[in-house]
Curated annotation (Swiss-Prot):
Monomer. Part of the FGAM synthase complex composed of 1 PurL, 1 PurQ and 2 PurS subunits. GO terms for biological process: 'de novo' IMP biosynthetic process. It comes from Campylobacter lari (strain RM2100 / D67 / ATCC BAA-1060). Its EC number is 6.3.5.3. GO terms for molecular function: ATP binding; magnesium ion binding; phosphoribosylformylglycinamidine synthase activity. Substrate binds at residues 87-90, 109, 237, 309-311, 531. Mg(2+) 2 binds at residues 110, 265. The active site is at residues 42, 88. Belongs to the FGAMS family. PANTHER family: PHOSPHORIBOSYLFORMYLGLYCINAMIDINE SYNTHASE SUBUNIT PURL. It catalyses: N(2)-formyl-N(1)-(5-phospho-beta-D-ribosyl)glycinamide + L-glutamine + ATP + H2O = 2-formamido-N(1)-(5-O-phospho-beta-D-ribosyl)acetamidine + L-glutamate + ADP + phosphate + H(+). This is Phosphoribosylformylglycinamidine synthase subunit PurL. Mg(2+) 1 binds at residues 86, 529.
């Protein structure tokens, strides 16, 4: 085969030799395209699988861990929560509206294909410098396009987007991150899996017709960007949320029957990945008649049909004899449905075109036994250069505070979350903007389901292992602050070019941090995604392992607020402040540095803090609780006051005034109802605590900082809109 064609398919010399060994001959173009997609980083996880294998994935409440379309946990009274987070970074950078919209569509399908109705969405967004003279305007365009795409798709689907995070840093100038999370619920007995078994069982294509959009998407998402990447725009899929809504309702109707064996979303690599994954999981073979595929465009080829990433499509393995009943359901909802193949016992994928065999590929070497790479790793040299950094506050705490409050990483993101419908389905208890975790009521069992998503990329740059562990601890802490017990996580691991040994070292360390934290905190990994090649012109993003956590309280009425109210009688700090300025926002703003060292996570102290929060909430001692994050105590208090429309008069006992900005983990601000009961309770449980102060009607006073509540709110609520223009 022509070497240029092989190169265009991102197949290495070693991989091509392996293809020859597997097939026993030269591949044709169709076979090369299929193998290229299945062996892409996006589909095969060939660089990352080695490090993912040790993740803790089991617990009594885990029903389904990694390996399916989404993870599943038991949330009580025979109900399950189905959830996953994944990336759509590369398409969103090329075409922000369409890329973000189809990212939402893809994650929704991953959840409802398991048999669950989607009840909540979240997102984690990272953009570059919006103030830069050269690229600031483009970054603002990306922000607006991505947010518009997410809101368009989610709102049209009738799925509440209830939370998320949005951060900005120069490391994302050339590669933005768009990570989408979805959660659904169903009865445990009604969960469906992606399998294709039973010789002769029909394979049915359902959903929208196949077009040429998204061709080569999986391969594109497995490569770095450069100046010519704008030409990749045709590889970004086009989404139709109204078609997806019909598809979801049709699938949920189908799931009430006994007509099917398994079902799989057509995501990256389209018909290729769905067919190979279903057959591969089941140890089966499959025969596909590609000319039977519903087509949107004329003259489409087998290559295009196998690799198109047109949206809103599913592949079903039905029980023989029930195929017409399946088709009838989808036709009723105005969707295409066609029998395009059947299950075999050959262990091979047989591809036919108008009766002619045009492709014959063994399934296992492309699915369950795809190549795994052992890439070289090297500790980055920059770590030695940054570790000795020490932060010194050289301006007044008042000035530092106002700079932090006005920073785009702190200021309120109402511009974003007000575009999302957070109350549709009428289950939302805490949505975006309410600080901390987001919560919904599950009407079927009246439980509180809380979820949070986060990644502090600066911490992961300073120490990839501790930074990843800190993300796991932080989302769990937010869940506990909402009154729910953290149960499990889903991860989306965003890193740079795996061909760079320093990036692979960061990735390996990040995985170690997640393994350690999940094991110690008893929050297993149930689903996830890896996004590599987040690099442009040789510049990689900071390591960014996004972690989403889900937790439960059996009583929905036990939801705990994240900011003060008139019922707050006193304000307390829980946890120990250790002067951790490594990777802090204050260091980035004042010294223009992402440097220093991180404190190890004290997992026993973390668990003790979670336990206290849950028990104190159960005892009705707390009015509110909020995990301390970027900007430290000062910014956490400021947000709680701004949201509550209440001031405070507070004082710390720190010898170093700058400690109000440090970012030590395992700390929480609580507003207490009954101070006497609180002190008794906190002493009994052995939690480190210190009184900060009380509410104030008009001013925000913290040590040397004094600002009117009105001015604080103006800065906090208005700055982000000013920046976007």
């Amino acid at each position: 085969m022509d070497k240029e064609i092989i190169k265009q398919h991102k197949i290495s010399d070693e991989e091509y030799q392996e293809i020859l060994n597997i097939l026993g001959r030269e591949p044709n173009l169709l076979e090369l395209g299929v193998i290229s997609a299945m062996w892409s980083e996006h589909c095969s996880y060939k660089s990352s699988k080695k490090y993912l294998s040790g993740f803790p994935t089991k617990a009594p409440w885990v029903i389904q861990g990694p390996g399916e379309n989404a993870g599943v946990i038991d949330i009580g009274k025979k109900m399950a929560a189905v959830f996953k987070v994944e990336s759509h970074n590369h398409p969103s950078f090329i075409e922000p509206f369409a890329g973000a919209a189809t990212g939402v569509g893809g994650i929704l399908r991953d959840v409802f294909t398991m048999g669950a109705r989607v009840v909540a969405g979240m997102n984690s967004l990272k953009f570059g410098n919006i103030h830069d003279e050269k690229i600031g305007k483009h970054q603002k365009y990306l922000v607006k396009g991505v947010v518009s795409g997410i809101s368009h798709y989610g709102n049209c689907m009738g799925v509440p987007t209830i939370g998320g995070e949005c951060a900005f840093d120069e490391c994302f100038n050339g590669n933005i991150l768009v990570n989408a999370f979805a959660l659904g619920t169903c009865k445990i007995k009604d969960i469906f899996y992606a399998k294709a078994e039973g010789i002769g069982n029909p394979v049915i294509y359902v959903g929208s017709k196949t077009g040429r959009d998204g061709l080569g998407g999986a391969v594109m998402a497995s490569d770095s960007f450069n100046e010519s990447s704008k030409s990749l725009r045709p590889t970004v899929q086009i989404g139709d949320p109204f078609a997806e809504k019909l598809l979801m309702e049709a699938c949920l109707e189908l799931f009430k029957t006994d007509y099917i064996v398994g079902i799989q979303d057509m995501g990256a690599a389209g018909l290729t990945s769905s067919s190979f994954e279903m057959a591969g999981r089941s140890g089966s073979g499959m025969r596909l008649y590609l000319d039977k595929t519903p087509m949107r465009e004329e003259g489409m080829t087998p290559y295009e049909l196998m690799l198109s990433e047109s949206q809103e499509r599913m592949l079903i393995c039905a029980k023989k004899g029930y195929e017409e009943k399946v088709i009838e359901i989808f036709n009723k909802w105005g969707l295409d449905a066609a029998i395009i193949g059947e299950v075999t016992d050959s262990g091979k994928m047989e591809l036919f075109w108008h009766g002619e065999l045009v492709g014959l590929i063994p399934i296992e070497p492309l699915s369950e036994k795809a190549p795994i790479l052992d890439r070289p790793v090297a500790r980055p040299k920059y770590l030695d250069e940054i570790k000795n950094y020490k932060f010194n506050l050289n301006i007044s705490t008042q000035e530092a505070f106002e700079k932090l409050l006005a920073n785009e990483n702190v200021s309120n993101k109402a511009y974003i979350y007000e575009q999302f419908d957070s109350s549709v389905q009428t289950n939302t208890l805490k949505s975006d903007g309410a600080l901390g975790a987001n919560s919904i009521r599950i009407k079927e069992n009246n439980c509180l389901l809380s979820m949070a998503i986060e990644c502090n990329s600066r911490l992961n740059y300073v120490n990839p292992k501790i930074g990843a562990a800190a993300a796991v601890a932080s989302v769990g802490r937010k869940i506990a602050c909402s009154g729910a017990k953290p149960l499990a996580i889903s991860d989306c691991l965003n890193y740079g070019n795996p061909q760079n040994p320093e990036v692979m070292w960061q990735f390996a360390q990040g995985c170690e941090g997640i393994k350690l934290a999940c094991k110690e905190l008893n929050t297993p990994v149930v689903s996830g995604n890896v996004s590599l090649y987040n690099e442009t012109d040789g510049v990689s993003i900071f390591p960014s392992p996004t972690i989403a956590c889900v937790g439960v309280n059996e009583k929905a009425e036990n939801v705990l607020k994240s900011y003060f109210s008139k019922d707050t009688s006193a304000i307390y700090l829980l946890g120990e402040s250790k002067g951790s300025f490594g990777g802090s926002l204050i260091a980035k703003i004042l010294d223009k540095k992402v440097a220093g060292e991180l404190e190890d996570i004290d997992f026993s102290a973390e668990l003790k803090l979670w336990d206290f929060l849950l028990k104190a909430n159960e005892a009705k001692i707390l009015d509110c609780a909020n995990s301390i994050g970027i900007g430290g105590i000062a910014i956490t208090l400021a947000k709680m006051c701004a949201m509550a429309n209440l001031g405070i008069n507070a004082k710390t006992n720190f010898a170093d005034k700058s400690f109000i900005f440090e970012e030590s983990p395992t700390r929480v601000i609580v507003g207490v109802k009954d101070e006497e009961e609180f002190i008794k309770f906190v002493n009994e449980m052995g939690i480190n605590f210190a009184k900060l102060g009380n509410l104030d009607e008009k001013d925000f006073i913290l040590d040397d900082i004094k600002i009117s509540l009105a001015k604080l709110q103006t800065i906090y609520f208005d700055k982000f809109n000013e920046y976007l223009g």
